[in-house]
Amino acid sequence: MENSHPPHHHHQQPPPQPGPSGERRNHHWRSYKLMIDPALKKGHHKLYRYDGQHFSLAMSSNRPVEIVEDPRVVGIWTKNKELELSVPKFKIDEFYVGPVPPKQVTFAKLNDNIRENFLRDMCKKYGEVEEVEILYNPKTKKHLGIAKVVFATVRGAKDAVQHLHSTSVMGNIIHVELDTKGETRMRFYELLVTGRYTPQTLPVGELDAVSPIVNETLQLSDALKRLKDGGLSAGCGSGSSSVTPNSGGTPFSQDTAYSSCRLDTPNSYGQGTPLTPRLGTPFSQDSSYSSRQPTPSYLFSQDPAVTFKARRHESKFTDAYNRRHEHHYVHNSPAVTAVAGATAAFRGSSDLPFGAVGGTGGSSGPPFKAQPQDSATFAHTPPPAQATPAPGFKSAFSPYQTPVAHFPPPPEEPTATAAFGARDSGEFRRAPAPPPLPPAEPLAKEKPGTPPGPPPPDTNSMELGGRPTFGWSPEPCDSPGTPTLESSPAGPEKPHDSLDSRIEMLLKEQRTKLLFLREPDSDTELQMEGSPISSSSSQLSPLAPFGTNSQPGFRGPTPPSSRPSSTGLEDISPTPLPDSDEDEELDLGLGPRPPPEPGPPDPAGLLSQTAEVALDLVGDRTPTSEKMDEGQQSSGEDMEISDDEMPSAPITSADCPKPMVVTPGAAAVAAPSVLAPTLPLPPPPGFPPLPPPPPPPPPQPGFPMPPPLPPPPPPPPPAHPAVTVPPPPLPAPPGVPPPPILPPLPPFPPGLFPVMQVDMSHVLGGQWGGMPMSFQMQTQVLSRLMTGQGACPYPPFMAAAAAAASAGLQFVNLPPYRGPFSLSNSGPGRGQHWPPLPKFDPSVPPPGYMPRQEDPHKATVDGVLLVVLKELKAIMKRDLNRKMVEVVAFRAFDEWWDKKERMAKASLTPVKSGEHKDEDRPKPKDRIASCLLESWGKGEGLGYEGLGLGIGLRGAIRLPSFKVKRKEPPDTTSSGDQKRLRPSTSVDEEDEESERERDRDMADTPCELAKRDPKGVGVRRRPARPLELDSGGEEDEKESLSASSSSSASSSSGSSTTSPSSSASDKEEEQESTEEEEEAEEEEEEEVPRSQLSSSSTSSTSDKDDDDDDSDDRDESENDDEDTALSEASEKDEGDSDEEETVSIVTSKAEATSSSESSESSEFESSSESSPSSSEDEEEVVAREEEEEEEEEEMVAEESMASAGPEDFEQDGEEAALAPGAPAVDSLGMEEEVDIETEAVAPEERPSMLDEPPLPVGVEEPADSREPPEEPGLSQEGAMLLSPEPPAKEVEARPPLSPERAPEHDLEVEPEPPMMLPLPLQPPLPPPRPPRPPSPPPEPETTDASHPSVPPEPLAEDHPPHTPGLCGSLAKSQSTETVPATPGGEPPLSGGSSGLSLSSPQVPGSPFSYPAPSPSLSSGGLPRTPGRDFSFTPTFSEPSGPLLLPVCPLPTGRRDERSGPLASPVLLETGLPLPLPLPLPLPLALPAVLRAQARAPTPLPPLLPAPLASCPPPMKRKPGRPRRSPPSMLSLDGPLVRPPAGAALGRELLLLPGQPQTPVFPSTHDPRTVTLDFRNAGIPAPPPPLPPQPPPPPPPPPVEPTKLPFKELDNQWPSEAIPPGPRGRDEVTEEYMELAKSRGPWRRPPKKRHEDLVPPAGSPELSPPQPLFRPRSEFEEMTILYDIWNGGIDEEDIRFLCVTYERLLQQDNGMDWLNDTLWVYHPSTSLSSAKKKKRDDGIREHVTGCARSEGFYTIDKKDKLRYLNSSRASTDEPPADTQGMSIPAQPHASTRAGSERRSEQRRLLSSFTGSCDSDLLKFNQLKFRKKKLKFCKSHIHDWGLFAMEPIAADEMVIEYVGQNIRQVIADMREKRYEDEGIGSSYMFRVDHDTIIDATKCGNFARFINHSCNPNCYAKVITVESQKKIVIYSKQHINVNEEITYDYKFPIEDVKIPCLCGSENCRGTLN
């Protein structure tokens, strides 16, 4: 400051202040100047001047500045530069502490033309992009194809990875993965910069270019993996643990830490925070590391899952501790030591000196690097401090980390005090693990498939320590038991599967099963390695969750919320899983382990175990380790996440058997081979479990699951050969030792639900996959599925699980697994329902659980396990092969049968079943992928059957691939095919299949259509039994094809436990099976006579076989068991078939619960394949016999058809053979049908029926008794039926019976006529199949019979559904195939199945053409699975329509037999209640009855009435034509109640169901004997229609009484007998249910004869039958039911729900849940909005129906788009109808001459007139004669205006019409338009203050485009003082030439590109 001061202006001076601050403070001075500085001027006080005016001291000498100016140079301030002060963000580098959010995505293999902007635009759609960086070679500046994109949100990163990975961008398939810390990218960068790889050869799949084999190494050692991840080669467990996140060594180190975290310690797990935190900073690393650990900080710090995942996302390797540990955490602290111990353990092997960590025991933070040698041991050596991380750890869940299962971690380590806390406390201290394997060695070993036995990290410490590599030790196995479910797939296995393979697996819907099967080969080694199986396994297991999430990113970090269920386990695990996929590929490079991430947090147990082992072994496998960590942490989450894995979670145990499954995470990866050698494997099932590893939960830091919930006991070491380290048994509730033998049950609910949530669409796949399902809906559906499956508590399932495990079955898909978890998980800690379960670390032992000690015999155990697994796999393979062979054989037989049937039905409607089969056959292979789902859907054991998830035990065991046919529902549905519905296919699949088949059959034959009820098919698995042989054969063939082609898939999906080799074996067996099948065919041929003699038995066998085929897929073992038992008794056999079918649908249901369940149990235990194989073999043998019988029947039917025509149809050959006398002998199948029906009718009725068969027509007495009115008619009908001579034609020809009579033919005397409610039920049943033409059924009908599938379908249409039993079972038992309905024979109608079929006659016009919605429908008698049944039971138009349609129940009959009550309830739900014209209570009761019926086999006299009630629905005969009115039958049945015509119809419907129940008739048992009346019934319709009232067709044409076995007669009469009425219907339903139940598997009903197919047009029964729609599958029903989660529920639905609830309460069926349920009113939530009407053509339909009264329709963009593509040069003339078109309605131009004259005149005028006059003239002329213009899509831009007539030069073309507005308004509008998104400007400036706005109103001139070389110009003319803009032609314009003019926009800075494309285009409009 200068001493001189300006003059002071005191007046301006502010009050003096001691200091500048004073005045400034008071006056807020902006500036001040020290005027006097005492230092310069002695003796002066400091003097400040403020703002040039005020002084600090008042001094006279002070003068303020007169002009205050800014002293700074002004120039620099003239321009304002915007300064962006961006909010600083944390830089997440190697020093970042805590879980790294997986927001960073690494792109690899990018096209070198991709630049930042392009990449940013590409990623923007997935979320806000914070940073985009493309890496270039620093020297050459060459594009490396690698890019980093940092998203603002984890979700955005995950979505980007999910949607962009493996997609083609600029011609390159790019690799996208979550690279949390960029380690993967740096690795790639190093690999590229070093020149080792080119951008396109970059080993992204392996994630670590260093060691593409890392996967293998991964399994062996985390350290190795880490090394690899770090870029080190597999062997590099180096000191440079985390030198560089990307460095080969470093990343691994981090990765190692990361992976090691997973492997041996929470620390490692913790990844972000120092690994050591466990000790000193338990929270920092441990908590983070072991999401399971209670310590939140630990969790938070290194939420292994979170951190891991996040890191992993960044860079799988780096993601893990690799980066963190090494870089900061591990080194950081002693805590790191602990963590490091863990981390180092796995990372050490690769990068850090895990030894340090391990050796330190968690005390030395630096040890990671310091003790490279320890890396191998690190895991095993529990870090000293490790033991102590504290419970606190657990609480700290990193948002990203996958929380450990929240169940109290089973105390794996004694140290681990708290479940997780203990673990943490244990500091992940692992009980001293077996000596660490050399990292490299373990890796190598693991790959080899020998358990390398990498030094098992302290199992305890590992498990406790944050899911270190538990894989090694059995103990970890124990803990990871649950994790196994999740983990096993998660870590190691997942790595194996690349994201692509995993996705592929998911797409194939084989998530759990397929993966399992797929991995068979790698099963010896850890599947995880490279094999998709491992991936599969992962998917199946924890991995699956990743698959489910299918987010390569971190599940935990990124999607904490992603996993609904994973509390703490955020999406980390799931994400990592996908990450693992993606990462795994990348991580492979980094280390084999990267995939581990996929392993959802193993419940700490298996995954941890495996992870530990794998990670330990592959110390370097950071991704794995990370995954493992996450997997462990988010083990539960993963489980949940693994929706893919839905079954996966359960699979864990089941998976266990599979190597991949067994090894949760790493175990799966390192799996048996790696684990076995070095790690002590969990003791084999027989061995006492090793000390459980630390509770799996601790390893899962993220698992928020309440600790109290003890994870299920860790799965015992899986017996699967593939699983080196079987998952330890799931930890039992705290204190409860996990069952050593049983594989851990994955928390079923959690896994299932969470998985379902995530993966539901996958699981549901084709069926539901497409449908939008809200989380709630998915949860509900899953829950329902689970419920259906009957989540068994672990213990119950344990036996099965153990068996399955030992058998090599995987519970992967088995709900049971889930079941147990659901119980324990759900119960205690599972805050969430099932989904959360996975969260809790199932593998985590209960809090008190003692961690397993490394088993010194682990290697031995592992070796043994491997051997056992191999053997199991071999067995499974053998079984699968046999099954496949059988499938092939049966398929061949089916083809042959179809061919024969087609030939037989040549005169009738063509049968497409054969074709369908052929079509289907190929499908099996495709289906293999969906096989899982199919099998799941079919798997009765599963609750998914309805869902079609194909996740059930059955699904797993079943070789869905065999049943892949399911995908060809048409096949099943096609009557022609007469295939029984393939149980193996998922319900939905079945539906599809049945629909397809039905469609084909419908095309071929209405009969077939009727038989094959698309819905029925979908709904009932076995209902198509009637086509059993055919179906079986075809199905088997298909199965075999699918099995052989996708044997692995089949194996995987079919039997989780099936070893990888299973596929091969399966194929081999398939060949064997084929041979067997061929032999079987021969046998069948030989047996034909035998079967004829005991057609019931044969029929049963055949049906059973078919059933088995279906059932095999769905529940092979169940079917096998049931079939085996049932095969002995034809009736029983039939019941079995039916039951099997039912079971397939209701496996988890009541019926299935017991016999089915036990079968399933044993099946699962025995190895899904072997037991199914056996069952299938047996079943197939039976099927073959049946088929042979059916063939014979077909032949006979052909003969009889030749002789009797329709009768032959009905008899299907067999009946023909039986002839009049046949009724008694009718074929056991028929008898069986009758039996069922009879049962439904009454016990006595059945006997009477049996006795009655011989009775002549006169024996109609009982019928009379039952229904006196029907007696006469019945007698006639019965006579016809009995009489061999009367053919179906006769029946058809017959005038409609009087109401009495009509019923009579139906009457097959059901004991309880009332039960047989003649309701539209019957019609509804038939409706699915289109009414058959009344034409006499061609002999080919017999063929139909042969093709069970076909008959059911035709039956559906023509034949009334079999009696309940028949429908459900009879179809099978009756063996429609065996007993082809004679075309003319009505008797078959009487026959249980035929009767049923007939009973539900299909009115010619009936919409009910029975496509055989249910198998019962399909075969006419085929029962439908309950869900399906109900589904398929449509409401009938008949008065009885309300009848619940036992039809549904019918199909359920079989189902019921299997599922018992469940089936019944389903029926009720779907079938009975739906139609519900019956009293609701009745339907409710019906379910009980159905249930009972389902349970009870044929002999359920008491229930008979109920089944009958249900039976009516099956009745498919058209009301107009009686199926068969076998008087004898009726008599046998007892007094027939003749309902009014309508009633009769209902009765028929009922009868059908009921008849099958009367097994008394031999025909019932003898399929051959059983002439399917369905056909005839359908045919009988032709006779003069009875009054609409009588449901039965007109007096049955001369039915073949003889042909109509009594059973058939019975079937018939019951429907007639059942009087229409609420009671009748109820009774009928009940009876039907009973019948179905008693009837067991239905015989394939013979294919419907043409007659049957086409009901007589005249039959009054046609009374407008309500359209019969394909019965909905259980899945569809569930979809509809749970659609409330999507669309809400309206008042009506709420009301009905309430009513149903009340009725159920009244019914009191012993449903405990009902008593525990309280109805609470809830407001409707329906948000449905009117659906937009779709217009197929451009012309809009007029709302008012009249164009003149219609207003103007605005044309929406969609409509316009239709024309955009059309060429501009459309016809010169406007379309005749311009209604929906945008062509201006302009008067047609006058003659061309006139036009030309006017144009010439205008030119002349313009030449001599002033411009104004000329313009005015032109304008006026234009007004009078508009030019013909049109707007079309323009090549210039969007729409354009085109001339429709030649326009001369200088002619006025059009006026630019719009609103005249002022500039101000124009400006406002322009802004508003922009806001509204109106991009184009239609404002035309007239002058400086006037603008014409044509935006909202105007004419076509607004469409004129700009051109730089226009053919028109705009001119402003004044008309009546108004300025107008007119477009004039500049030159001659031709027709279809576009009108253009120069917009002449003012020149502006912002240029608008010109698109005119003219030669002299300026390029811009302005």
Curated annotation (Swiss-Prot):
Short motif (WDR5 interaction motif (WIN)): ranges: 1745-1750
Positions of the SET domain: 1827-1944
Record key words, sorted: Activator, Chromatin regulator, Chromosome, Coiled coil, Cytoplasm, Disease variant, Epilepsy, Intellectual disability, Methyltransferase, Nucleus, Phosphoprotein, RNA-binding, S-adenosyl-L-methionine, Transcription, Transcription regulation, Transferase
GO annotation (BP), single: methylation
Stretches with biased composition (Pro residues): 432-441, 449-458, 592-603, 679-719, 1312-1340, 1501-1514, 1580-1600
Extent of Basic residues compositional bias: 1-12, 1515-1524
Highest rank taxon of the organism: Eukaryota
Function field: Histone methyltransferase that catalyzes methyl group transfer from S-adenosyl-L-methionine to the epsilon-amino group of 'Lys-4' of histone H3 (H3K4) via a non-processive mechanism. Part of chromatin remodeling machinery, forms H3K4me1, H3K4me2 and H3K4me3 methylation marks at active chromatin sites where transcription and DNA repair take place. Plays an essential role in regulating the transcriptional programming of multipotent hematopoietic progenitor cells and lymphoid lineage specification during hematopoiesis.
Native organism: Homo sapiens (Human)
Domain Post-SET: 1950-1966
Residues passing through the membrane, by range: none
Region of interest called Disordered, as start-end residue ranges on this chain: 1-26, 235-302, 357-660, 675-719, 963-1462, 1501-1541, 1555-1606, 1636-1668, 1767-1800
Record's disease association: Intellectual developmental disorder with seizures and language delay: An autosomal dominant neurodevelopmental disorder characterized by mild to profound intellectual development impairment, speech and language delay, and seizures. Autism and anxiety are common features. Facial dysmorphism, tapering fingers, and pigmentary skin changes may also be observed.
Sequence ranges of Basic and acidic residues compositional bias: 493-521, 995-1015
Composition bias type Polar residues, residue spans: 243-259, 265-274, 282-300
Reactions this protein catalyses: L-lysyl(4)-[histone H3] + S-adenosyl-L-methionine = N(6)-methyl-L-lysyl(4)-[histone H3] + S-adenosyl-L-homocysteine + H(+); N(6)-methyl-L-lysyl(4)-[histone H3] + S-adenosyl-L-methionine = N(6),N(6)-dimethyl-L-lysyl(4)-[histone H3] + S-adenosyl-L-homocysteine + H(+); N(6),N(6)-dimethyl-L-lysyl(4)-[histone H3] + S-adenosyl-L-methionine = N(6),N(6),N(6)-trimethyl-L-lysyl(4)-[histone H3] + S-adenosyl-L-homocysteine + H(+)
Name of protein: Histone-lysine N-methyltransferase SETD1B
Phosphoserine modifications at: S986, S994, S1031, S1265, S1283, S1335, S1659, S1663
